[in-house]
Curated annotation (Swiss-Prot):
Protein's name according to its UniProt entry: Methyl-CpG-binding domain protein 5/6 homolog sba
Annotated region described as Disordered, given as residue ranges: 81-115, 427-457, 556-579, 630-694, 839-862, 940-980, 1179-1247, 1287-1339, 1471-1497
Other information: Named 'six-banded' due to its distinctive embryonic expression pattern.
Biased composition (Pro residues): 440-449
Function: Non-catalytic component of the polycomb repressive deubiquitinase (PR-DUB) complex, a complex that specifically mediates deubiquitination of histone H2A monoubiquitinated at 'Lys-119' (H2AK118ub1). Important for maintaining stability of the PR-DUB complex. Probable epigenetic regulator involved in developmental pattern formation and eye development.
SUPFAM superfamilies the record matches: DNA-binding domain, Tudor/PWWP/MBT
Molecular function (Gene Ontology), one example: DNA binding
Lineage of the organism: Eukaryota, Metazoa, Ecdysozoa, Arthropoda, Hexapoda
The keyword Coiled coil is assigned to this record: yes
Subunit annotation: Component of the polycomb repressive deubiquitinase (PR-DUB) complex, at least composed of caly/calypso, Asx and sba (MDB5/6 homolog). Interacts (via MBD domain) with Asx (via PHD domain); the interaction is important for the stability of the PR-DUB complex.
Domain MBD: 238-308
Coiled-coil region list: 1415-1446
Native source species: Drosophila melanogaster (Fruit fly)
UniProt xrefs under InterPro entries: DNA-bd_dom_sf, Methyl_CpG_DNA-bd, PWWP_dom
Length: 1583
């Protein structure tokens, strides 16, 4: 027993520390920071005055804990006497604490607290004792029965359980699956009885001590309870079990109107039915404050309009709730304050945690994390424990058992870990845990959640195990408090706090290979992890629960049951957020922390971004791959969360689709309240497509057909960085429904790749459980279902309509969720990628077939954007019953995939009758562009998901090499068509051929027209298979939506407002505004063109202005430039000559042509959610041959010059230009000006994502020179983003890890670039090899040489010409302002006043001119320039001429450029040969076009610009050397370095520090000595 007690103490300490961390966060949040901080160590929830009273005892207790900790550390077996003493201390402390807890916890209410409040208190005391003894070792808090004797027994039991749990926890720590832990989850009564016996047997001394303490505690608790009504919670809980004394919880509103009752939650959510209530309660991120702890929604929420409002009287609960702000309220506090206490506690906590974490890592703490109310901490803990317990299948029927279940959760290593974190809180809130376990999140609990949650949240997304609550045996009223936890995007802060501990532990493990950096190594790692998880994780998980074995990794909160799945989803959101924040590696099922590839961090932190990234490997249960079905329950968060987060979580590819045993969850929150059977049938469960994705995926992907409840939301494993499944989780998800999408496991296996987002749009999926008949093992059917689900989820507001004919209409509601695509803001809303086996038709109930499109494009792309799929089940015109013939449909999808960048709805139907399928196309639709990340630039930054299907990523790598090589076998058009589509081609060559962008159009004849509607464009590109078909029916729609006329425009383009589709009968069909949808209509040769129907050219000439053409089925080509003339600014530089690149209408679409160059490495850009821009560049392809320059991707969501604000989602959308133009093949003016209405500008945050790789040049569409992509807001991003288009676009592909922080990416880039660079120098484009410097180091802000001309904000203008001058005499520039320079502005009228300007705000001359021109273009109302500005510019030009004349007398535009090396006194060591080389190149370029940056010099200016723009290339000048040395982080390439210094100085030295190996070769070209030492001389561009 001594040993057990020692172990318990150890665990207790660990748990307490964890809980302390969480608790500290809570306390901070709750505002009881002082008390709780004291008590945090003892109890997270010492919310009451008793806490203060107990402080001394607590301190003592804390001391004991410390002693225990020392014991734990030494693992010394403490004698029973010592343990008794400790217990006595615990007793005293616990008594006080328990009183406090009773006050605190009671509000949450003991789950089993049927007895008096005193009993509750006693139970709390016992629990506290147990917890203290365990230091939250005991996850299972046995709810004291009403009898004090039972309480004593319970104490004994708890002690025994504690010991057991300790042993179990130890086992768990040892990573031994603790099957016994599940036993601990026995119902409280049983446990109480058992513990009475076992307690005595187990450890008499502790039992006796516990009894004594319990007696004392009971007396004390009775008094306290009487005094404090602490038992009110328990009473309420008891009441709640049967009935509540009211129907209106504090903080909630109950409105009656017309005999209809609506409850309005504290967060403003309106709930009109019990289903909605339950769904809300079970959803993460929803505010459940004020609800009694054991919550029986049926009893509390009375929808009988005849019953008046009866406020619930929860004195204790109210008191608890009052002191601590709601989680939602506290999120801010938590994010800030929590981190401090948490960090402190975490440090301690981590020490213990680290010990336990190894064991605990895998435990899906997340599940249980969310707890509501003051009990939140313990609740979270218990929830975790409970969820684990549930997972363990050891779900105690009674709520009281939930603590026990929590104990069972210890079986999960992760649970242990969380348990540790939570346990600490539990010690404080033992009863609360029980209470918390009850789904009802008392308003108070949520505050605690923040406190308790942070750690667990770190482990669990937002620490909200939605599934947990449902799983909670709490009277079966499963309220998924996770919703509350997840509720606001704020959860990420919580996650951050919690994540910190986890991250700290996890991050060391982050060393795992990135998919991007080392795909082979990564895959191997993933495979190994998968196998390990299958072997080890399965044992542990199986122990927990056969099906629920899948543990929710912090990152992959795949929960065991659908509820768990919901939790997982929520957790995933939270986790993703956390990951995004902290790049926490997800915990592998085994105890090990799996490091997610850097991209994982990319996943949007926003809760909204919900990446259902399931580590397939983590969850893969070889035996039960079927279980893989994960029910994604969209949290009813205000912001639709997309998994992206990717998209958010860019974890290593989820090898397996989320595996969740859906069977456990009673209901799928996903399914909307009215799921009709048909809809259920049609609801496709996207089964990931086996495609090239990670082979292991299939294992997880296999969904058990029986797991109908869970939609298989399988994130393509391969997409590590991307959150495959963007679930728009609508708050409206109806809890009761299940969308059981059962696809045959085999089908699922095949579907592995596809991301099925079973997102339940709030009402999208009809409420009735969708029992998909997929069991027939038609993967495609599952896909259809998933599509339907995706549609449902996608249109959070979208409606899934089952027509009488049985067709599914998914109509995304633009307003509600905004069509997911349309609303990039709701990133990941509908990601239903149907990535089914190629060309499988799934019979729909209506008899229509939904062809799952093998092409990953739709699936992959859909992930990032919420895609709405409208599956036609047959008959309805809107939706034709045959959704798509497999290939044809696929082709359409592929095509849409190509255009998929914008979240588009693709209406896939080959339906003869012109049925429309609206499928919102995931932006990354074209698998070919694995890299294509659909980062919706849309404002919801957090929600932006970068989703690249794992296939895509791998495909990008493999396909780029292979796909390009293997264009669709049959279709020459396919071959011609950009390989983008081709990647899908391998799956189905014929369909893929069609898929290819042009090919799709060409293939269109088979398929009826395609409409691509991009929200910005609001046009439909209709590829008509036969122009002649129904020429009469065509109507020309203006973008304003007016119908100009019904014209028989066979060859003409019809502009249709986003929502309108023309029916074959010439009727206009308005599909709700799906701004981002692409409608593919079978008939109608309508090609949407902006103004002009066609460009005659039947052939696409890559060189033609760099335009890309869309080929209509009728053979019409419309230059993309025309088609997308709108600022949407689809940027498609010239189509690659090899194959026409398909331009995707969606502004965000990134069309990357996978040229024949098979660069193994797909570059994927992971965008932070905020960044809408993503550049997906197949850098590899660029590497291919110089002849076809790498695709240049333009990310110009915003003009770089202007602050990054999303002007409009459309314009903000990233415009990715993929051009494989020969170096200057595309005239910059045409491409840039036309293509990129907004300057290419990648947000810094994107750059931050390591994944973000800017392919080479960014096209400034409007200006030939490439606009510097400087993401105005983010300095670092600038360099990272900077793409050097240079003459050689290929060189431009730099994977600049936009943020220096993304060193790994950078380094990768470095490696890559050097080869290019080596070519480059020869080419003379000398694109400033920014990537090398970028990669090599975080680049400090750009440095400017004295005398250099710059642009900067002055005189109220964003860009004003100025000149770097020496520091004025007598002025001392503080060292901290090394990043500032003295600037003298031109046009001062003789005044030579210089200002100290931050370097970051300055732009090089060329950049400034560019920005200036752009700004004028954008803002100038009159053609007249400000005369002062004009004068200033003239002065600057004159000065420039003087400087160039003096410094480089022979400054010819020739590549030879005199480089004046200015010694940079404090030059950063970072600046290395590469940089110098780049600088030299820049100099050359600049010399070549000294002022050409202004000029629209086609090749050079642009290359210069880009090279310069790349943050990598920096010219350090003496004046700025110091600046640079400190600030490489933001380095704006100075395209033009105007250095007064004579070029002579180091010209020809050629001694260039080769800091970057890549730079070395290039460096040789550059002359000038640059030492990489601290005072490195920096090559200054003389020109």
């Amino acid at each position: 027993m001594a040993a057990a007690s020692a172990g318990q103490q150890q665990q207790q300490h660990q748990h307490q520390h964890k809980l302390n961390i969480a608790g500290s966060a809570e306390t901070v949040v709750s505002g009881m920071q002082h008390q709780q901080q004291h008590q945090q160590q003892h109890q997270q929830i010492n919310m009451f005055k008793q806490q203060q009273q107990m402080l001394p005892l607590q301190q003592q207790h804390h001391q004991f804990f410390q002693q225990q900790q020392t014991k734990f550390v030494s693992r010394v077996v403490t004698s029973a006497a010592v343990h008794q003493q400790q217990q006595q201390h615990h007793h005293q402390q616990q008594q006080q604490q328990q009183h406090q807890q009773q006050q605190q916890i009671l509000p949450a209410g003991l789950v089993n607290g049927n007895g008096s409040g005193n009993m509750m208190q006693v139970a709390n005391l016992h629990l506290q004792q147990q917890q203290q003894q365990r230091n939250s070792q005991q996850h299972i808090f046995v709810c004291p029965t009403s009898n004090q004797q039972l309480l004593l027994q319970q104490q004994q039991q708890q002690q025994q359980q504690q010991q057991q749990q300790q042993t179990k926890q130890r086992q768990a720590q040892i990573k031994l699956p603790i099957k016994s832990a599940a036993t601990t989850g026995v119902t409280a009564a049983t446990v109480a009885a058992a513990t009475a016996a076992t307690g005595a047997t187990h450890c008499m001394s502790t039992t006796i001590a516990a009894r004594q303490m319990s007696q004392n505690n009971q007396l004390y608790a009775k008094n306290v309870a009487k005094a404090n009504n602490a038992s009110s919670n328990g009473n309420i809980n008891r009441k709640t079990a049967t009935s509540y004394n009211g129907n209106l919880a504090p903080g909630w509103r109950r409105l009656t109107n017309n005999n209809e009752v609506a409850y309005i939650s504290p967060s403003g959510k309106t709930l009109r039915t019990q289903f909605q209530i339950k769904d809300y309660l079970l959803t993460q991120g929803t505010c459940k404050c004020g609800l009694p702890c054991p919550l029986r929604p049926e009893y509390l929420f009375d929808f009988n309009a005849q019953v008046p409002n009866q406020p619930l009287k929860l004195p204790t609960e109210a008191s608890t709730a009052t002191p601590t702000p709601c989680r939602h309220q506290r999120r801010f506090l938590e994010s800030q304050q929590l981190q401090l206490p948490q960090q402190q506690q975490q440090q301690q906590h981590l020490q213990h945690q680290q010990q336990q974490q190894q064991a605990v890592k895998d435990v899906s703490v997340d599940v249980a994390v969310s707890v509501s109310g003051p009990a939140a901490v313990s609740d979270v803990f218990s929830t975790l424990m409970t969820s684990t317990a549930r997972t363990a299948t050891m779900v105690t029927p009674t709520a009281a058992t939930s603590p026990a279940q929590a104990a069972t959760t210890t079986t999960h290593e992760m649970a242990n870990k969380d348990a540790d974190c939570h346990k600490y809180g539990n010690n404080k809130l033992p009863a609360t845990n029980r209470t918390a376990t009850t789904p009802t999140p008392a308003p108070t609990p949520p505050p605690q959640h923040p406190n308790g949650m942070p750690t667990s949240q770190a482990l669990a997304l937002g620490g909200v195990p939605v599934g947990v609550h449902p799983k909670r045996p709490t009277g079966g009223h499963v309220i998924k408090q996770p919703a509350s936890v997840l509720g606001p995007p704020c959860t990420p802060p919580l996650a951050v706090g919690g994540a910190n501990t986890v991250i700290q532990q996890q991050q060391p493990l982050q060393q795992h290979p990135n998919f991007k950096d080392d795909p082979a190594g990564y895959l191997q790692q993933q495979t190994a992890l998968l196998h390990n998880s299958l072997g080890v994780g399965l044992d542990a998980t199986k122990t927990a629960a056969g099906t629920s074995t899948a543990r929710a990794l912090p990152q992959e909160p795949i929960v065991h049951s659908s509820q768990q799945q919901q939790q997982q989803q929520q957790q995933q959101l939270q986790q993703q957020q956390q990951l995004q924040r902290q790049k926490i590696r997800r915990l592998s099922l085994f105890g090990k922390w799996e490091t997610d590839p850097a991209p994982a961090t990319n996943s949007q932190p926003t809760n909204g971004t919900r990446a259902l990234q399931v580590d397939a490997a983590a969850f893969a249960r070889p035996q039960k791959p079927q279980v893989t079905c994960v029910t994604l329950v969209p949290p009813p968060q205000e912001s639709p969360v997309s998994s992206s987060a990717a998209e958010t979580l860019e974890k290593r590819p989820e090898q397996v689709g989320a595996i969740s045993t859906s069977h456990e969850s009673p209901r799928q929150s996903l399914s909307s309240p009215t799921d009709s059977v048909d809809s259920a049938k049609s609801t496709p469960s996207a089964s990931p497509k086996p495609q090239t994705q990670v082979p292991m995926q299939p294992q997880l992907l296999q969904m058990r057909p029986h797991l109908q409840a869970n939609l298989s939301a399988q994130t393509p494993v391969t997409v590590p960085a991307h959150v495959r499944v963007m679930r728009q989780q609508q708050a409206q998800i109806i809890p009761g429904q299940r969308l059981p999408v059962a696809s045959s496991s085999a089908a699922m296996a095949t579907m592995t790749r596809s991301i099925v987002t079973s997102t339940a749009g709030t009402s999208t999926i009809t409420g009735r459980p969708v029992a998909t008949t997929l069991n027939n093992s038609n993967p495609t059917v599952a896909q259809l279902q998933s599509m339907a689900n995706a549609m449902n989820g996608a249109g959070g507001g979208g409606q899934l309509i089952m027509t009488s004919s049985g067709q599914l209409l998914v109509i995304p509601t633009p307003s509600k969720q905004t069509t997911q695509h349309h609303r990039p803001g709701q990133p990941g809303q509908g990601v239903i990628i149907q990535q089914q086996q190629p060309a499988e038709l799934h019979p729909q109930p209506g008899g229509g077939y939904i062809v799952s499109q093998p092409s990953p494009v739709a699936a992959a792309s859909s992930s990032s954007s919420s895609s709405t799929v409208i599956l036609n089940s047959g008959g309805a015109k809107l939706l034709h019953h045959q959704i798509i013939t497999s290939q044809a449909g696929q082709i359409n999808q592929a095509t849409s995939g190509g255009s998929g960048n914008q979240p588009q709805t693709v209406l896939l139907n080959t339906l003869p009758n012109g049925g429309y399928i609206v499928q919102q196309q995931p932006q990354t639709q074209s698998p070919q562009q694995a890299e294509q990340i659909l980062a919706m630039p849309q404002p919801p930054p957090a929600q932006t998901l970068i989703i690249s299907s794992p296939d895509t990523k791998r495909r990008a790598r493999k396909r780029k090499s292979s796909v390009c090589h293997t264009p669709p076998p049959s279709g020459s058009p396919a071959k011609i068509i950009s390989p983008q589509i081709s990647p899908s081609i391998p799956n189905q060559a014929p369909a893929l051929l069609h898929q290819q962008a042009a090919a799709a159009a060409a293939a269109a004849p088979q398929f009826q027209q395609q409409f691509q509607l991009s929200p910005g464009i609001q046009g439909i590109v209709v590829n008509k298979p036969n122009p002649p078909q129904q020429p009469q029916t065509q109507q020309l729609l203006l973008q304003n939506g007016q119908i100009l006329q019904q014209v028989n425009l066979i060859g003409q383009q019809l502009l249709m407002p986003a929502g309108l589709v023309m029916g074959p009968d010439a009727t206009l069909l308005q599909i709700q505004n799906m701004p981002a949808t692409s409608l593919m209509t079978p008939q109608g040769p309508v090609m949407l063109r902006t103004p002009s129907p066609q460009n005659k050219p039947s052939f696409i000439s890559p060189s033609a202005g760099g335009q890309q053409y869309l080929v209509g089925a009728n053979g019409q080509l419309s230059p993309i430039g025309q088609i997308y003339s709108t600022p949407m600014g689809l940027v498609m530089p010239t189509g690659q000559q090899g194959g026409a690149s398909f331009v995707q209408a969606s502004p965000t679409t990134t069309t990357i042509q996978i040229q024949q160059q098979p660069a193994p490495q797909p570059t994927q850009i992971s965008l932070q959610p905020a960044q809408a821009t993503y550049m997906t560049e197949t850098v590899m392809s660029r590497q291919g041959t110089a002849a076809s320059p790498p695709d240049t991707t333009t990310c110009s969501p915003r003009s770089p010059e202007r602050p990054s604000s999303h002007r409009s989602s459309g314009s903000d959308m990233v415009q990715c230009v993929s051009s494989s133009e020969p170096d200057a093949a595309v005239s910059p003016q045409s491409t840039e000006s036309r293509q990129s209405p907004s300057s290419t500008d990648c947000e810094r945050s994107i750059c931050k994502n390591n994944v973000f790789t800017q392919p080479s040049g960014i096209y400034k569409h409007s200006e030939p020179k490439i606009r510097r992509i400087h993401i105005t807001s983010q300095t670092s991003a600038e360099n990272g983003i900077s793409l050097m288009q240079g003459q050689e676009s290929p060189t431009t592909t730099q994977l600049l890890s936009s943020v220096p922080t993304a060193q790994p990416t950078v380094e990768k880039t470095t490696v890559r670039t050097p080869t290019k660079r080596s070519r480059r120098p020869q080419r003379g484009a000398a694109r400033a090899a920014p990537s090398a410097s970028d990669k090599s180091f975080p680049l400090p802000p750009r440095s400017f040489a004295i005398g250099e001309l710059i642009w900067g904000p002055a005189r109220g203008h964003p860009a004003w010409p100025g000149k770097i001058v020496k520091m004025p005499d007598g002025v001392c520039t503080p060292s901290q302002q090394f990043d500032h320079v003295w600037v003298q502005w031109f046009g001062g009228g003789g005044r030579s006043t210089s200002e100290l300007i931050p370097v970051n705000s300055l732009q090089s001359l060329s950049e400034g001119l560019e920005a200036h021109h752009k700004a004028q273009k954008d803002t100038r109302k009159s053609r007249k320039l400000n005369s002062q500005l004009e004068r200033a510019i003239q002065e600057a030009m004159t000065e420039l001429d003087n400087i160039s004349a003096s410094s480089t007398p022979a400054a010819t535009s020739s590549s030879s450029a005199t480089i004046s090396a200015v010694p940079a006194s404090a030059g950063p060591a970072v600046i290395g040969g590469q940089q110098q080389y780049q600088q030299q190149q820049q100099q050359q370029q600049q010399q070549q076009s000294p002022s050409s940056t202004n000029n629209k010099i086609n090749g050079l200016a642009r290359s210069k610009r880009q090279a310069n723009t790349s943050g990598a290339s920096m010219v350090l000048t003496t004046s700025t050397a110091a600046t640079l040395s400190g600030l490489f982080n933001q380095q704006r390439a100075k395209p033009i370095r105007i250095a007064p210094a004579p070029p002579v100085a180091t010209t020809g030295t050629g001694n260039i520090g080769t800091i970057a190996a890549a730079g070395a070769a290039a460096a040789s070209t550059g002359t000038g000595t640059a030492t990489t030492s601290a005072r490195s001389e920096i090559l200054k561009l003389a020109k």
